[in-house]
């Protein structure tokens, strides 16, 4: 983290007060949809119960050596990153369980990381491939 980013964080936190909310990790597979209307309602319901999504966790499989299937899975993960941003979660954790061809998967995950940064979300990838 750069000095500038650290000082921004320190200033923001110093001017803050504790909130009575419980941070939670949501599992992407438990979401009924990534549609904005569903996410808006879920966010409201979570807040009413005193929960704040901190992390959205997703499982990913890149088990087929096929560009179309790799792109389809990358698109699904992009929807999850957008959902995390919409919900106010600061992190998306992707558990990669299968990789058929790293040369196809690594660029897709790099693009996903760039998207996450643009959405204001931190991305971490766990499993046999890294970003």
Model-derived features: positions:
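N-terminal pre-domain/capping segments
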Residues: 1-71, 75
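Active-site acidic/histidine proton-transfer and metal-coordination neighborhood
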Residues: 65-131
């Amino acid at each position: 983290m750069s000095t500038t980013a650290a000082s921004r964080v320190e200033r923001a936190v110093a001017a803050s007060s504790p909130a009575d909310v419980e941070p939670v990790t949501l599992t992407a597979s438990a979401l009924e949809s990534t549609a904005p209307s569903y996410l808006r309602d879920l966010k409201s319901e979570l807040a009413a119960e005193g929960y704040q999504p901190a992390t959205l966790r997703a499982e990913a499989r890149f088990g087929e050596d096929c560009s179309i299937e790799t792109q389809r899975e990358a698109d699904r993960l992009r929807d999850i990153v957008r959902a995390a941003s919409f919900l106010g979660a600061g992190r998306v954790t992707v558990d990669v369980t299968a990789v058929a061809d790293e040369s196809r998967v690594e660029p897709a995950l790099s693009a996903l990381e760039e998207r996450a940064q643009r959405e204001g979300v931190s991305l971490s990838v766990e499993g046999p491939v890294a970003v």
